[in-house]
Amino acid sequence: MASKYQSVQPGGSLIIAWRAQGKKVLIVGGGVVAAGRILHVLNADAHVIVVSPKAGLCKEVAWRIQEKQVEWRDRGFLVEDLSDDVNMVLTAIDDPSLSSEIYKLCKSKKIPVNAADIPPECDFYFGSEIRNGPLQIMVSTNGKGPKLASLIRKKIESSINPATGMALEKTGLLRQKLRDIVPEPENSRKRMRWMIEICELWSLEELAMLDENLINRLLGYFPKKTPSYREITTPAYSKIDNYIWFGAIIISGAVLLKHVSKAR
């Protein structure tokens, strides 16, 4: 008998969005692979420490050092680099034995570590990522096929509405303002239900066009009504049964006037 619950698919990774703001991430290496890792963690607002002699720096890493985007230690790896305040370690070097040594040291200190190109010595993987404003989508093959992950990511990315990133930004502003207006915990269900209805009713393009004026106008309907974009943006409006309907009776009103004129 088939279960009504979803089947377990073992062998996957736990894909989470880890908040790394201000956390110290140690990156051993300064080549092209390290450059990609550095960008990933800088995008997460982490404090990046690069350990690599100057001769091992690629142009991008050298530029980020020059721009003071990262902290740089101009030398090879030392055990002292694994201080107690390091939250994550990434190795991106062409020395498998040193990578393995760093991996073992990190495990002994319970520091999450990723050793590039050595899947068995990775606590986590870097997937192929899509970024559109607040939207982040990661495609991971769990180390099986990085190139395929990249191809799949491109297919997904091509299908994403260009307005998505801005729509998410504006939805976040609307959600925060609603929380500021009605912060009480007992209103959480009403807030959630109203926001769900807005997201289902409005298109991404409409959400992306929200500005402060429209947000304030929209919040005036909470919690009694979920208006459409057209209702709050059409200049002409009438009050019916204590609700504001924008432009909804213009056509019918014109027809009514025509009939009145004929009657006269």
Curated annotation (Swiss-Prot):
<comment type="pathway">
    <text>Porphyrin-containing compound metabolism; siroheme biosynthesis; siroheme from sirohydrochlorin: step 1/1.</text>
</comment>
<dbReference type="InterPro" id="IPR028162">
    <property type="entry name" value="Met8_C"/>
</dbReference>
<dbReference type="InterPro" id="IPR028161">
    <property type="entry name" value="Met8-like"/>
</dbReference>
<feature type="binding site">
    <location>
        <begin position="53"/>
        <end position="56"/>
    </location>
    <ligand>
        <name>NAD(+)</name>
    </ligand>
</feature>
<dbReference type="Pfam" id="PF14823">
    <property type="entry name" value="Sirohm_synth_C"/>
</dbReference>
<dbReference type="Pfam" id="PF14824">
    <property type="entry name" value="Sirohm_synth_M"/>
</dbReference>
<dbReference type="InterPro" id="IPR036291">
    <property type="entry name" value="NAD(P)-bd_dom_sf"/>
</dbReference>
<dbReference type="GO" id="GO:0000103">
    <property type="term" value="P:sulfate assimilation"/>
</dbReference>
<protein>
    <recommendedName>
        <fullName>Siroheme biosynthesis protein met8</fullName>
        <ecNumber>1.3.1.76</ecNumber>
        <ecNumber>4.99.1.4</ecNumber>
    </recommendedName>
</protein>
<dbReference type="GO" id="GO:0005634">
    <property type="term" value="C:nucleus"/>
</dbReference>
<dbReference type="GO" id="GO:0019354">
    <property type="term" value="P:siroheme biosynthetic process"/>
</dbReference>
<comment type="function">
    <text>Catalyzes the conversion of precorrin-2 into siroheme. This reaction consist of the NAD-dependent oxidation of precorrin-2 into sirohydrochlorin and its subsequent ferrochelation into siroheme.</text>
</comment>
<dbReference type="GO" id="GO:0005829">
    <property type="term" value="C:cytosol"/>
</dbReference>
<dbReference type="GO" id="GO:0051266">
    <property type="term" value="F:sirohydrochlorin ferrochelatase activity"/>
</dbReference>
<dbReference type="InterPro" id="IPR028281">
    <property type="entry name" value="Sirohaem_synthase_central"/>
</dbReference>
<keyword id="KW-0627">Porphyrin biosynthesis</keyword>
<dbReference type="Pfam" id="PF13241">
    <property type="entry name" value="NAD_binding_7"/>
</dbReference>
<dbReference type="GO" id="GO:0043115">
    <property type="term" value="F:precorrin-2 dehydrogenase activity"/>
</dbReference>
<keyword id="KW-0539">Nucleus</keyword>
<keyword id="KW-0560">Oxidoreductase</keyword>
<keyword id="KW-0963">Cytoplasm</keyword>
<dbReference type="InterPro" id="IPR006367">
    <property type="entry name" value="Sirohaem_synthase_N"/>
</dbReference>
<feature type="binding site">
    <location>
        <begin position="32"/>
        <end position="33"/>
    </location>
    <ligand>
        <name>NAD(+)</name>
    </ligand>
</feature>
<comment type="similarity">
    <text>Belongs to the precorrin-2 dehydrogenase / sirohydrochlorin ferrochelatase family. MET8 subfamily.</text>
</comment>
<keyword id="KW-0456">Lyase</keyword>
<keyword id="KW-0511">Multifunctional enzyme</keyword>
<keyword id="KW-0520">NAD</keyword>
<feature type="active site" description="Proton acceptor">
    <location>
        <position position="117"/>
    </location>
</feature>
<comment type="pathway">
    <text>Porphyrin-containing compound metabolism; siroheme biosynthesis; sirohydrochlorin from precorrin-2: step 1/1.</text>
</comment>
